[in-house]
Amino acid sequence: KNFAGNRLYRVACGPSGADYHWTEVMMQNLTPALTDAIALHFYSVPEWNNKGSATEFDDDAYYSVMDCANEMEQLLKMHTAIMERYDPENKIALVVDEWGTWYDVEPGTHPGYLYQQNTMRDAIVAGLSLNIFNKMTRRLQMANIAQMVNVLQAMALTDGDRMLLTPTYHVFRMYNVHQDALFVPSDYKAGEIVSETGRRCADLSVSTSRDRHGVLHVSIVNPSLAKAKKLTLAFDKLKPASVEGEILATDDIHDHNTFENSELVAPKAFDGAKIKGRNINLTIPAASVIVLEIK
């Protein structure tokens, strides 16, 4: 109940993963007077009984997590389609109340505290996920990574009076240019990466927005461990005058920040995007996240 001029934002317990029947039944019975949103719960975990190490993993384990992370887009599309049938006026939102990676806890830590390290693999998952969320904002109103500090795919890790920022934090900071901006549709026909054991994921992920000053920001993720990807950004009405960017990438996908080396994984300036007429050409290194600012 609302008191003292405050208004509660009420979120109904929604589905876990691909439980579309749950969403169907909920939407048959909910009204905007009862709730503001339904929550979707999904982690990028291929095997719950064998989550694996956060820092020691082979290529197949890497691509299995990418495959799982990419599943988020299909989940959002399917749940949204159900909600559209019952709520075409978009009065009930969809929120992702928990998402992210989940591995075995770090050796020597309490199993109930879910403390795990955070590598470039997690940065790629963060970038892929945020790009997906950007595309779905008509219905999707909130997406909460789990969690902020010292738990699962955290932004920061602490030890006494020491603190470090994780690769996931850096992706979130790079992507903050999309906040309060207007989503700009872009057409990219993604190819597919297929691992030796049949794991699949899109070969590139792209999302674009325009801020209140008219500046375009393009976030790009290349999840391939082995191949750089050439990309041409072609604009119908804009003739770009300048482009600059940041990149998050390292030589080893297992790289992570420690209290002894807290800046091993950190963004750097990216000057590899070149303007040619109405196009911008660039090469996205393997296993990297890039955000461009285009004026």
Predicted regions and their residues:
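Aromatic-lined carbohydrate-recognition surfaces of secreted/lumenal glycan-active proteins
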Residues: 1-20, 71-101, 139-150
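The substrate-binding groove and active-site-proximal loops of carbohydrate-active enzymes
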Residues: 9-16, 56-73, 112-122
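Flexible loop/turn segments at secondary-structure boundaries
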Residues: 17-22, 44-49, 100-106, 149-155, ...
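Alpha-helical scaffolding within the catalytic cores
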Residues: 19-30, 128, 202-203
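Aromatic- and acid-rich polysaccharide-binding/catalytic face
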Residues: 24-70, 92-93, 97-102, 115, ...
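Conserved, mostly hydrophobic/aromatic
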Residues: 38, 79, 98, 143, ...
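Aromatic/acidic polysaccharide-binding cleft in carbohydrate-active enzymes
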Residues: 91-206, 215
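C-terminal beta-sandwich/jelly-roll accessory domains of carbohydrate-active enzymes
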Residues: 187-191, 196-201, 213, 221-295
